[in-house]
Amino acid sequence: MRIQLLRHYFALTLLLITSISSASPFGLSTVAAVVSANTASTASPKTFVFSAIPDQDEANLQERFDKVAVYLQDQLGIEVRYIPVKSYAAAVTAFRNNQVQLAWFGGLSGVQARRLVPGSQAIAQGTEDPFFTSYIIAHSSTGIEPSDSLPAAITGKTFTFGSKGSTSGRLMPEHFIRENLGDTPNNLFSKVGYSGDHSRTIALVQSGAYEVGAVNYKVWDKQLADGKIDSDKVKVIWRTPSYPDYQWTVRGDVNNSWGPDFQARLTEALLSMDDPDLLASFPRSGFIAADNKLYQPILDTAISVGIIDADQ
């Protein structure tokens, strides 16, 4: 269809040049120059768009990732824009529909997105992401103390995960709960909720709305350092074993739109990011190379928990 449209366009262009050049006082060269300029305009690279899973407050993410967009624009020499999404599922959908070409995904959402878009690649991850962990946190009223093993005393309590699509706020905590306590969350807890993001999980447990919850350790540590957590009301009672988590994933067709070396240049720009203010957007100390096979354990776990269908 696109080829046919181009043929019609150039046929009409030739007819226009032929008819106008004989009558126009500006002559053939002027008309040709106008056509050339219009053709160049239509061939200009489109805006490169990226997003990120909404694992924290949306307003903060917008402010921080807008700065990342400026950085990438300077590095790549094209227009770059960040767009927020309302949920983890919305981030995956935007990637699938090519509304965004790059996304800062969690381990699970990245696996889901790459399964939907063949050829897409994990290209960079945070320095901390190969060894990511989750915290199990509890309200002080439970009387549960920190332990090196998952406290069985959480059984029967109300429990909130983060987003249903979160690696650190749902998938891996659920996996370790099943592994350590021998049953599903719905059977173990008196009530199971999904807060939507890590910041809300902390707020819900701190307020006592839920007695226990699972949270991304980076979000907890940052909020604690920022003075947003009341340690008299909520505390970490267990830290999970490590697992691979967040990564930058890019669609496999970006080179078709921005040039044969675009993915390589994009990867280099991400790996070279060293401005502490930009890195605080994630928050990470830096980025290292990543690839799809690093996230096979996440896929395997998602299949075993029942979040991903192995036959899809």
Identify the role of each PLM range.
Residues Y9-S22:
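Bacterial N-terminal signal peptides
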Residues S36-F65, F287:
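Extracytoplasmic "Venus flytrap"
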Residues W104-V117, R178-E179, L204-S207, E211-S231:
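A ligand-binding cleft/hinge motif common to bilobed small-molecule-binding domains
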Residues V49, I53-P54, E128-Y135, K228-L270, ...:
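Periplasmic-binding protein-like
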Residues F26-L28, A33, T158-E179, A264-Q312:
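Ligand-binding clefts/hinges and TM-proximal coupling segments of bilobed small-molecule sensing domains
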Residues G126-G182:
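A conserved helix-loop-strand patch within extracytoplasmic ligand-binding domains
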Residues D66-G77, S168-Y194, K222-D230, S304-I308:
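Ligand-binding cleft/hinge of the Venus flytrap
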Residues Y82-T93, G106-L108, T184-A203, P244:
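Short helix-initiation/N-cap motifs at beta->coil->alpha
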